Structures are given as structure tokens and as C-alpha cells.
């Protein structure tokens, strides 16, 4: 009986370890690590570009580092415009907004997937594993953008250049990409980007809308 009890005790001790190993990495820690990564990045950008970092931004990142979802949401509400992709504060209408937006976006994806680490791994790993090092990755959906960017950028060195096509008409986002990627990839100059966007707008106004495009015109 003593031998059986001893074996059961050992099994009871080992079973949680086996289950823990099978569960894989905790993506919640990835969220916090990415928050630290973007906190460092926004501080570097502020120093390099001589831009003041508002206290609300610092409070946002402190909440993110602590993994406090409610505080993260409350702090973001003080900085975010009606358009969730844009800043409300003039001090953040520049390269500093993207690290905040990317951090918040990852938190939203993580919460939306019910904090399921296994599901996050099944989503992100095949995408990154399918690309050779040095690839340029365009993330269109929130999960495709924020989750993949986080997993990619926490690797040393990051294997891919992650960006979103949804932000390419935004001059502040393009300026952000130029700062973080520099001359490692080609990016259009501001005047070229603006000219391309103007051409697209002109085409839409003339009725030359690409097949399958979803275009809405507001206020003329």
C-alpha cells in the first residue's frame, strides 16, 4: 500500500508539470513583453525626434506592462480620437502614436480570443514559419496585424518586416515606418505617397473604381 501511495503521489506531482508543458507558452506573457518592447520603442522615438511624451502615454504603458486590461482601456480613452486608429492629442499625432496603437491592438486581439494561448500560437506560428527571413508582411486584419507583429518583433532579430496596408495612406504611419525600418526596406518618399493617394482619389471621383474595391465618399 505504501508503494502504491508513493507512486500515486509522484504521479500527482508530475501530472501538472506534464499538462503545463503540453499547454505551450503563455501568450499573456507575450502581450506584456510586447508592451515592454513598444514602451522602449516609443521612448527611443521621442528622444530621437525630440518629441515630448505625454504623461498619459507613460501611464498607458505602465498599465500594459502590469497586464491591467481595464486600466489599459481607460488610459487609451484619454488619448484616442473617435477614429480608433488616430490620436486625439496633438502631441501624439506623429510617429509616437503607432507604438501605442500596436500595443492596444494586441490587447484587443488577446481579449477577443478569450486569452487562449494555444489558439494564438496556432494562428501566428504558421504565418511566420511560412515566410523566409527578410520577407515583408502585410497584416490587414487586427489579428493578422497585431498578433503576428508581436510574435515577430519579439524575436532576435525579427525575421520579417511587419506593416499594414491599411495605414499606407496615413503620413504619420509612413513616417513611423521610415523611422523603424530606415533604409533596410524601400518605402516611398512622402511626396510619392501623397501623389499616389491623390491619384487614387481622383480615379474614384471620375468613376474609375477598381473591381472589388469598397469605397465610401463622405462630405464630397
Segments and roles (model prediction):
Residues 1-11:
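Bacterial N-terminal signal peptides that target proteins for export
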Residues 9-20:
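Bacterial N-terminal signal peptides
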Residues 20-220:
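ER/secretory pathway lumenal C-terminal domains and tails of membrane proteins involved
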